[in-house]
Each structure stands twice: as C-alpha cells, then as structure tokens.
Amino acid sequence: SGAAPVTKIDITKTQVSLTVNGPDGLLTWTWSGGVVSTSNTQSTQVSSTPFDPAQFALDKIPSILTTAARLAGSESNQSLQIVEYNAGTVLMTVTTRPETRPVFFRADGSVINVLDFTTTQGMAEGLKDAVGASPLVRSITFDPAHGIVVDAPEQNSTASQNGKDLVIRRTRSAKLPVWSVPRQDDSPADLFSPTDVDPAVLAALVDASSKDRKNSDVPKLTIDMSHATSLPTITVDTDDAHTVHDLQGRDITNEVT
C-alpha cells in the first residue's frame, strides 16, 4: 500500500484484500493464489478512519479464527475484517457463511466477550470498555436494556457549544462492542474517577437485586455525585424499590438527601 492510508483489510483462507485511500480514491489490492491484483473501489470506506496494520495482532490470526469458531459455533467460510467500527475505533470482526453471530476482537487479539453483568468478570470488562481512556466521568449507569453507559467530558475540547458541555456517551451492551455518541449537556455534574468504582460491588448489587425477579425488573444502577458526598454513590432502582449505596455496597439511603 506504500504510504497510502489503509482503511480496510479482508482476510479469508484463500485471499487477502487491503483497501487504501489513495490520491485518486479508494484502491483495493488483492492477493489470491499467489497473484496480486488491484481495483478501484466504490465504497463508503473513504470516510473510514485509517489505521496501521502493524498495530494489529496479525500473527494471532490462527488463534483468533479458532476462538471465533468456538464462540460462533461455526468455522464455515470464515472471513476476518479489520475496519472502523464506530467513532474512530477500529476492530477485527470474524464472520461466517452461512451467517452466525459476528465475533469481535481488539487490536491486540483479545476477544470482546458477551458479558454477564451479574459476575465480577463481566462487569469489569464492560466497565473497562465503556470507560475507555477517560480519566474522569460524569456518570456511570447500568440497565439490562443498554448495559453499561458512561458519560464523560470530551477530552479534546474544553469549549462548550451553545452553553452546553460536550459529552461523549459510551455504551457497552452485553453482546456488542462499545458504541460512542457525542452529545451536548447543560446539566451540572461533578466529575469523579472511574477507578473508584469496584466492578465486584456493582455485580453483587445487580445479582442480589435481580434474584427471583423477572428480567424486566433487573435493577438500574446509577453511579454519580448527585448526593453531595465526597465520593460517588450507587443508586439502585427497581420497579418497587429505591436505595442508595456507598462504593462498598453499604446501604446509606437514610444518610443522604
């Protein structure tokens, strides 16, 4: 590809295709059967975030495909694609034909798991993914419909638009990678460090509150600074209860306003 920015890589058992955004538009280089060919490409990939293939664990492709086959339940006509997933985040995705569920991998080759938020492991991975690189956040919420949602200040800008702060909302659902959406918010909110939040405590609160309940009544958790305490609090809401907890999970409902 030379110095042209790479926007997509497709790999199957029989061929490798690499798409670059060159001076004359998108160009795809394809290796198949020892022969390299090129073709112009009509695609929305022209707007995709370019990436450096060397930053991806291409040496782990055999183990990636093995893991994907195990999780998807099929290795039929596997295809691995590296391309922007959302908001500048480039992921590896393995699909099959006939189609099963796609399996996503990070650049280092680690799998993006389907999560069980009632376990410490599931909550920890979801929280880490949703927080990303944000050193401070406005709020962290969990609910069964969306998974973990983190609102954090836009790190690359200290300015406001129309008097509203720029906020990045990052959502990590149980089955999909993080999806980021910029938004404006004029509501006041004190920031806190997400490292103060223990995923084991959150998982225990979800597990304890959801036992013997219908799935629709799995609790919603909200971690923020809304109770004017020195550290964030965890608010737990179900259809028939509202409690507030400290970061160790202790019920402090009667101690806060």
At which residue positions do the language-model features occur?
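DNA polymerase processivity clamps
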Residues: 5-17, 71-88, 141-143, 211-228
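Extended, hydrophobic interaction surfaces within ordered domains
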Residues: 63-109
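Compositionally biased P/S/T/G-rich terminal and signal peptide-adjacent segments
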Residues: 19-45, 161-182
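Short, surface-exposed beta-strand/loop "edge" segments at domain boundaries and coil↔beta transitions
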Residues: 23-29, 99-103, 155-162, 240-245
